[in-house]
Amino acid sequence: TVFTSGEASKRYLLQNFNNKKFFHIGPPRDFDLFKTFEDNKVLNIDDSDYLLCSGLFEEHEDDLGYYKNLLSKHITKKMICTNPDLIVDRGDKREYCAGSIAKSFEEINGEVIYFGKPYPPVYEIAADINNKKILCIGDNLNTDIRGANIQNFDSLLITGGIHRQEISKLSIENVLKNYDANINYFQKELKW
């Protein structure tokens, strides 16, 4: 079974925010998982009860200041962050992720509920699946591997991801030591 942070956040929203209005922060392509809640989506942030952050708006991919300004009047609302990663590599381009917006929201005293590695809710729900063999896969030592280490689950590090330059310069052993991380397996890439 493959279990994602998006699935974990969807379950949480069904249990806790089912009839609440939300403002979606992220590109339209990220919204497919949350179609169940489409009737509760509002286009004006002022009309929302909470904030659902899955990424950055396509027209504001490089400007975290834009989000601080947008969110500054809404710090009393909870933000649900569906991906705690701060950055992601898409091909050769490094981009901000939803976690960067969430951190910006916290910097202005907003409250964020994170779903995804390394935060416990995604593991608690995944471990409930009755699958006793859990392998956490990812390219980020700060989130993917740290979460696996905290939960004492096996992990597979994708070395061709965000740490590829560090690994190429320092060796995998030294990078793991620098991040105080342990892995069970590693490989360059993962193809579906």
Summary of predicted features, one role per range:
Residues 3, 7-192:
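Asp-based, Mg2+/Mn2+-dependent phosphohydrolase catalytic module
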